[in-house]
Amino acid sequence: MSDIKTKFINDPENITAELLEGYALAYPNQVKLAAENIVVRANPKGNDKVAIVTLGGSGHEPALSGFVGEGMLDCSVVGDVFAAPGAQRLFQALQLMDREAGILLVVLNHSGDVMSANMACQLAARKGIKVKKLLTHDDISAGIGANVDDRRGLAGCVPLYKILGAAAEEGKSLDELIEIGERYNKNVATLAVAMRSCTHPQNGGTIT
């Protein structure tokens, strides 16, 4: 069995921070690090337009931070490898994105992401931050027919980011964006296929 290295990693314990720092350095005209594990647009749009925010674990780069930019996401909140970011970090991002037009939080249907999003939105509501959630559940391999709630949010989020981001740039309201997103969710399905299991860069364990 080959022992050829397939990853360039300085320190497995610091991999997420280095991934995001490297990405921000590589594309300074597109993104910047606003805080630890929070990636935002280098040139933000006005507060009169809805901010599009998402969250998820690292380890899938350039997703999800690679979709931050004009006409797409305004902010990506990143967790550890294959793990959701904590509610406090997401709440910090919502505070940074707070604006009159409101925030649309796009949440991929994974238990950790959903839990963090629910808690962060509760904290935001107490602070008077205008935010609404949109849950994506496109992966039909995890839930067939009526079991929509069992479906994971996967690659179907990418066109959604573009559609919502472009609509937000045009000045669509938060309610209009929710309507667009819900219509999209009803008409998209993806199927996850993998050639082999992946390995965790920090502990080397196999993930199936």
Name each model-derived stretch.
Residues 1-52, 206-208:
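N-terminal amphipathic/basic leader segments beginning at the initiator methionine
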Residues 2-4, 47-55, 64-77, 141-144:
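Gly-rich Lys/Arg/Thr-decorated short loops/hinges at beta-loop-alpha junctions or inter-strand turns
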Residues 57-62, 108-117, 152-157:
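Gly/Ser/Thr-rich loops at beta-strand to alpha-helix junctions
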Residues 60, 67-100:
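Glycine-rich oxoanion-binding loops at beta->alpha junctions
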Residues 76-81, 125-150:
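Short, acidic/small-residue loops that bind anionic groups at enzyme active sites
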Residues 114-128:
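Short Gly/Thr/Asp-enriched flexible loops that form oxyanion-binding sites at enzyme active sites
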Residues 142-151, 161-208:
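Internal, active-site/partner-interface "lid" segment
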